[in-house]
């Protein structure tokens, strides 16, 4: 309900994005499905996607979510990378290789922040590049406890890690 209230109060937004979480899906699955209809970008992890749709075919899930109206759907799959759906395409990308995971807490939020930061600067034309940006940012988050690694991250470091990400 809060998300719908916020959306209704924003006048002429550039875009609306939602990043789901298990609690919402557990308590309000119908509301989450309605929320998808109101956003331009929908992000969630693979477990949340399967829980919400009741099956494990992630390509079909991406298409289901896209049919509700978002321009971009991104399913985060942790160490298996992510799945980006837009238009009639579904692209899978890797995570950044050879990252020592110290603490995965906040990786999904960092990923979403990286995606949205890219889109805020460059627009919606390249959702795969946006997801690569998010993947790179998240790689810094998981390689330390808390946010300590993010304080010193510069754009050139983010771009260096993007070069290591593969389209699968």
Regions picked out by a protein language model, each given a short descriptive name:
Residues 1-41, 46-91, 123-125, 147, ...:
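Ribokinase/PfkB-type carbohydrate-kinase core domain
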């Amino acid at each position: 309900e809060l998300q719908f209230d916020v959306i209704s109060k924003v006048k002429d937004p550039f875009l609306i994005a939602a990043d789901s979480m298990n609690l919402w899906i557990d308590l309000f699955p119908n509301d989450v499905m309605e929320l998808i209809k109101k956003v331009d970008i929908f992000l969630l992890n693979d477990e949340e996607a399967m829980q919400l749709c009741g099956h494990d075919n992630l390509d079909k899930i991406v298409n289901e979510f896209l049919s509700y109206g978002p321009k971009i759907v991104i399913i985060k799959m942790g160490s298996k990378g992510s799945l980006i759906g837009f238009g009639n395409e579904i692209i899978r990308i890797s995570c950044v290789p050879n990252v020592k995971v110290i603490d995965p807490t906040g990786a999904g939020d960092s990923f979403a922040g990286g995606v949205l930061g890219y889109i805020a600067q460059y627009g919606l034309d390249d959702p795969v590049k946006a997801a690569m940006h998010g993947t790179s940012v998240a790689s810094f988050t998981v390689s330390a406890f808390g946010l300590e690694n993010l304080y010193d991250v510069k754009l050139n470091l983010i771009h260096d890690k993007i070069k290591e990400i593969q389209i699968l």
